[in-house]
Amino acid sequence: MTEFTHINQQGHAKMVDVSDKQITKRTAVAHSSITVNETIFKQISNNTNTKGNVLNTAQIAGIMAAKNTSTIIPMCHPLPLTGIDVHFSWDETNAPLYTLNIQTTVSTTGKTGVEMEALTAASATALTIYDMTKAVDKGMIIGETYLESKSGGKSGDFQRQSGQ
């Protein structure tokens, strides 16, 4: 059984000491999504939302969120991130509902992984899209948020299998 590393001998929270870990290249890819109605889909696609360019703003929010993960997730280490990317792709198969898939990739060269940074980026990206379009429809659905893959570090690589 795996032990919880963020709990000390007294049962209280602690931040894990990574001093003795090896410096390696670490990358994590996370996914989230938001399902919107046709009006919002058209506003985003045609860049006609009155608050501005929704995707550009959400992309910047995702990048900022990754950079600030350690300030909102208590046991995360502050990391010198070396790369953050946010990609979007529309799924139009269930029109008149449209799902915007969000994929975030975060990398560093360091002593601990960037899974939480990638997940935080994906979440903040979806939340920003909701915030910028909620005046049109508050019924949007933010979908599952999950880690797609990670590489580097002591625990090795991870690749989510379909259906996992």
UniProtKB/Swiss-Prot annotation:
UniProtKB keywords: Lyase, Molybdenum cofactor biosynthesis
Pfam families cross-referenced by the UniProt entry: MoaC
EC number(s) reported in the record: 4.6.1.17
UniProt catalytic activity: (8S)-3',8-cyclo-7,8-dihydroguanosine 5'-triphosphate = cyclic pyranopterin phosphate + diphosphate
Enzyme class: lyase
Record flagged with keyword Lyase: yes
Active-site residues (renumbered): D131
The UniProt record lists the keyword Lyase: yes
SS bond partners: none
InterPro entries membership: MoaC, MoaC_bact/euk, MoaC_sf, MoCo_biosynth_MoaA/MoaC, Mopterin_CF_biosynth-C_dom
Example GO BP: Mo-molybdopterin cofactor biosynthetic process
Entry's Gene Ontology molecular function annotations: cyclic pyranopterin monophosphate synthase activity
Annotated substrate binding sites: M75, C76, H77, M116, E117
Pathway in which this enzyme or protein is active: Cofactor biosynthesis; molybdopterin biosynthesis
Subunit field text: Homohexamer; trimer of dimers.
PANTHER family reported for this sequence: MOLYBDOPTERIN COFACTOR SYNTHESIS PROTEIN A
Function statement: Catalyzes the conversion of (8S)-3',8-cyclo-7,8-dihydroguanosine 5'-triphosphate to cyclic pyranopterin monophosphate (cPMP).
Family: Belongs to the MoaC family.
Protein name: Cyclic pyranopterin monophosphate synthase
